[in-house]
């Protein structure tokens, strides 16, 4: 699996002498055997070889327990290095190697955790490798919590940030059902889902317009965990409902969030009102607009005009006058 980790490597010709690749691997191996792990980032950065093989591939010659010990020692040695982005290549190669090894977990999760805690972001291809390794493990009938808790056997502990990256990886390759299972199972490993956890999966569900499941997850995060959905997540859900012409459900979601004392932003109200107008649900649009004004928001003038005109077109004169007065009072 070819991974290009930085612009310098991307500019390299694909054809390189085998000797230069072997020399780099030998140099890395020498530092590993001498436990001079802190020198490895400089080795990888200074190398001008475009890596068509992983410089840590020699790890495969070590027994599993020795491999775990070496990687753990290396991860610990990288923590104090500054700038924190300096070990980026090292983390990337370690993550690539562990995820493609015959027994990726729990070591790969430990590497991923340290990568994220360092502030480094795994390369995009990691989503594919992590999802593939995870699904292979799950096919062996291992539960979500069981796989995550294996980290404890090597001195690490699963956390929400690591789980959230796993969720984003599964969603990136459209494994949405598995993402939901991880979302529901991560609590068993002591990783309580947060707004980001739910936001990632809800956003992915909305992308493919699986609104029923997205609605259930939204209600679950609010009621079961007492979480406040991000405005971006809410907008995605309401937009998906509008695209599916399920505007009544969008209105119900806003009412649900208001009842649960969760804030609803201007963009969300405006989006739902426009959806109501598209379906000629003028009374419903007026209802949402009234609720919107009660929270200090006022629709755009074009939207206000459409609501009044729509109500008039269906002979809802009394309601049209009341809504107009409400808009006028708020403007003043």
Task: Pin down the residues of each PLM region.
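N-terminal targeting peptides
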Residues: 1-121, 125, 139-142, 319-332
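Pentatricopeptide repeat
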Residues: 20, 24, 40, 54-56, ...
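Residue-level detector of the short coil/turn that links helix A to helix B
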Residues: 35, 66, 102-103, 138-139, ...
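Alpha-helical solenoid repeat scaffolds, predominantly canonical TPR units
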Residues: 43, 74, 111, 147, ...
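Inter-helix linker motif
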Residues: 51, 82-83, 119, 155, ...
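C-terminal interaction modules of eukaryotic adaptor/scaffold proteins
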Residues: 278-332
């Amino acid at each position: 699996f070819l991974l290009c980790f930085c612009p310098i490597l991307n500019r390299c010709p694909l054809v390189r002498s085998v000797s230069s690749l072997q020399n780099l691997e030998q140099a890395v191996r020498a530092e590993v055997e001498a436990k001079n792990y802190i020198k490895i980032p400089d080795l990888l950065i200074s190398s001008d070889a475009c890596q068509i093989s992983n410089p840590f591939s020699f790890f495969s010659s070590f027994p599993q327990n020795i491999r775990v010990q070496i990687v753990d020692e290396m991860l610990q040695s990288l923590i104090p290095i500054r700038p924190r982005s300096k070990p980026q290549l090292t983390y990337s190669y370690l993550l690539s190697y562990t995820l493609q090894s015959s027994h990726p977990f729990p070591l790969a999760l430990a590497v991923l955790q340290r990568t994220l805690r360092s502030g480094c972001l795994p390369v995009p291809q990691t989503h594919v490798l992590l999802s593939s390794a995870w699904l292979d493990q799950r096919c062996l009938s291992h539960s979500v919590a069981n796989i995550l808790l294996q980290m404890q056997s090597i001195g690490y502990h699963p956390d929400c940030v690591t789980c959230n990256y796993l969720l984003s990886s599964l969603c990136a390759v459209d494994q949405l059902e598995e993402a939901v299972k991880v979302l529901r199972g991560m609590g068993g490993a002591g990783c309580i889902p947060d707004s980001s956890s739910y936001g990632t999966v809800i956003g992915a569900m909305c992308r493919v317009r699986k609104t029923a499941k997205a609605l259930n997850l939204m209600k679950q995060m609010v009621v079961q965990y007492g979480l406040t959905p991000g405005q971006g997540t809410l907008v995605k859900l309401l937009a998906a409902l509008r695209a599916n012409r399920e505007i009544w459900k969008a209105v119900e979601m806003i009412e649900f969030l208001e009842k649960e004392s969760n804030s609803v932003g201007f963009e969300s109200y405006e989006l739902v009102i426009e959806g109501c107008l598209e379906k000629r649900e003028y009374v419903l649009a007026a209802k949402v607009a009234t609720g919107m004004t009660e929270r200090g928001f006022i629709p755009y003038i074009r939207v206000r005009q459409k609501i009044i005109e729509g109500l008039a077109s269906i002979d809802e004169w009394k309601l049209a006058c009341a809504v107009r007065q409400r808009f006028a009072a708020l403007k003043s």
